[in-house]
Amino acid sequence: MSEARPFASQTGKSPSEKKRVTLRDVAEEAGVSLKTASNVINHTGRMTDATREKVQKVVDRLGYRINVSARNLNRGRTGFITLAVPCLTTPYLAGLANRVIDIARIYDYSVYVTTYAEGTSRGAASLLRNFNATVSDGMILSLSEMEDLTPEDLSVDYPLVCVGARFTHYKADHVTPDDVQSARLATEYLLDRGVSRPAVVGSRTDFAQLSTLRDVTEGNAQLRMRGVFEACCDRNIALATELMPNVGHDWSIGSGARNMQRIIDSGVPFDGVIALNDQLAMGALSTLAANGISVPDQVQVIGFDN
């Protein structure tokens, strides 16, 4: 029977003096081949339970730790993916980041999360162009409403998945919710409960452009407005100009509050509010409360998100 050789963890040396235990050390100490030791550590291969248990005891005693960098290099992968979003301040994008991280962990991946300056020279196009495949195996890109990507921007030589209601020119895998149908359902929910004069908080469409919404195929705001418009048209419900102010690209709580006040100040009667995201809905609710308007007794409110 071979005598166990002392390692740094057994000699009382300081951490800086400790010798890193290698897979070869484990194999020699256990009296097995490198392949067998590797199979035990990676939970693969066929061997007797006794052999597997013997090797595992050596692993535990020597304090062997997998060299992740070396393993990933051998496998031709980094073990990381990149998630790129316009910002992390909105609940939707923060929630997206959390879900991506949770799912990646199941597959033994870590996630680099980065933001980009949408609509600038350091926007998504720059990020795609300068992606470093030596530190990340691919990218999940949350598409910006403020930046139009060309086919050339999206023609990359690494795995790319785009998220959001923008056209990707069939150059990348693409995940997006059905904004039109979802907005229709939200609007119909209010109409089914007696709302006949709906207001909309979050529109980026001028009133004169409403008739063109049926042709819209991208953009969260435009697609959601299309769903609202179609649902109202089906019920012969008119949308008043004063009840759907153009908020631009600001879908924050503050914007919801300010634009709800604009609607109230217009003096045009309304009995329902369709907010195109939940932050706008929260802002609208605070303004309604500040004006003494009861929800849902006087005005019913619905938001769009989870």
Feature map (PLM): residue ranges:
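Short acidic active-site motifs
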Residues: 68-69, 123-127, 148-150, 255, ...
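Short beta-strand segments enriched in small/hydrophobic residues
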Residues: 29, 34-39, 74-89, 197-214
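Bacterial carbohydrate/catabolite-sensing allosteric modules
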Residues: 1-16, 61, 102-109, 155-162, ...
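N-terminal helix-turn-helix DNA-binding module of bacterial transcription factors
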Residues: 1-77
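Short beta-strand-centered segments that line the small-molecule binding cleft or hinge
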Residues: 124-180
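Small-residue (primarily alanine) positions within well-ordered alpha-helices
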Residues: 27-32, 38, 51, 70, ...
